[in-house]
Amino acid sequence: MRENRGWEVFSLLTSTEVYEERVVEVPEDVQLTIEGDSFRGYTLKAVGPKGENTRYLKYRGVFIEVGDGKVRVYTTSPKKKHKAMVGTFAGHIENLITGVKEGFEYHLKVVYAHFPIKVRVEGNEVIIENFIGEKHPRRAKIVGRAQVEISGQDIYVRGIDIEECGQTAANLEQATKIKRKDPRVFQDGIYIVKKP
């Protein structure tokens, strides 16, 4: 029989002892606002030199407070999962701030041995032509607001959201994966060489 968890939730809200805490500094040129609470979730909005971005974070028992140029993430629960989520939330907030302040950049390389690969951007896709001599082009989706710049054999994925940039770079790498061939011999493809 399942026990009533109402008392556990109530004790989380009324407890004053902090078991895990992380403080994230907010730079002067970044404005960070917060809405919500631990039950409904928090919506954080960051505005900086590179633009604006929002992030929704929710985990009952993990609290976020903004003030005096700092973001305080803490939990009043002694459970491991709650303590771990404090670090996760702090990491997401740091990425949110870094994105609007400096932005993120992934650097990829186009590698081929015999058939020259042609890469171009078309709308919200990257078209990869003549990959290992294939007649039909391969396509990789550009996620969200990420921007792709192609310069010879170098591809740069830039943006303010690390998840959008990372997924776009992964899409490019996955689109040129050769199946049922030894990767030590068939090394053609697009590979991530530098991450933020």
From Swiss-Prot:
<keyword id="KW-0687">Ribonucleoprotein</keyword>
<dbReference type="GO" id="GO:0022625">
    <property type="term" value="C:cytosolic large ribosomal subunit"/>
</dbReference>
<dbReference type="InterPro" id="IPR036789">
    <property type="entry name" value="Ribosomal_uL6-like_a/b-dom_sf"/>
</dbReference>
<dbReference type="GO" id="GO:0019843">
    <property type="term" value="F:rRNA binding"/>
</dbReference>
<dbReference type="GO" id="GO:0003735">
    <property type="term" value="F:structural constituent of ribosome"/>
</dbReference>
<dbReference type="InterPro" id="IPR002359">
    <property type="entry name" value="Ribosomal_uL6_CS2"/>
</dbReference>
<dbReference type="InterPro" id="IPR019907">
    <property type="entry name" value="Ribosomal_uL6_arc"/>
</dbReference>
<dbReference type="GO" id="GO:0002181">
    <property type="term" value="P:cytoplasmic translation"/>
</dbReference>
<comment type="similarity">
    <text>Belongs to the universal ribosomal protein uL6 family.</text>
</comment>
<keyword id="KW-0694">RNA-binding</keyword>
<dbReference type="InterPro" id="IPR000702">
    <property type="entry name" value="Ribosomal_uL6-like"/>
</dbReference>
<keyword id="KW-0689">Ribosomal protein</keyword>
<dbReference type="InterPro" id="IPR020040">
    <property type="entry name" value="Ribosomal_uL6_a/b-dom"/>
</dbReference>
<dbReference type="Pfam" id="PF00347">
    <property type="entry name" value="Ribosomal_L6"/>
</dbReference>
<comment type="function">
    <text>This protein binds to the 23S rRNA, and is important in its secondary structure. It is located near the subunit interface in the base of the L7/L12 stalk, and near the tRNA binding site of the peptidyltransferase center.</text>
</comment>
<protein>
    <recommendedName>
        <fullName>Large ribosomal subunit protein uL6</fullName>
    </recommendedName>
</protein>
<keyword id="KW-0699">rRNA-binding</keyword>
<comment type="subunit">
    <text>Part of the 50S ribosomal subunit.</text>
</comment>
